[in-house]
Amino acid sequence: GFTPFRIY
């Protein structure tokens, strides 16, 4: 879900 911690 594109955050600095997740690219999902």
Curated annotation (Swiss-Prot):
GO terms for molecular function: toxin activity. GO terms for cellular component: extracellular region. Expressed by the skin glands. The record marks Y8 as: Not sulfated. The keyword Glycosyltransferase does not apply. The keyword Secreted applies. Keywords: Amphibian defense peptide, G-protein coupled receptor impairing toxin, Secreted, Toxin, Vasoactive, Vasodilator. GO terms for biological process: defense response; vasodilation. Its main location: secreted. It is found in: Secreted. Produces in vitro relaxation of rat arterial smooth muscle and constriction of intestinal smooth muscle. May target bradykinin receptors (BDKRB). Belongs to the bradykinin-related peptide family. This is Des-Arg1,Pro2,Pro3-[Thr6]-phyllokinin. It comes from Physalaemus signifer (Girard's dwarf frog).
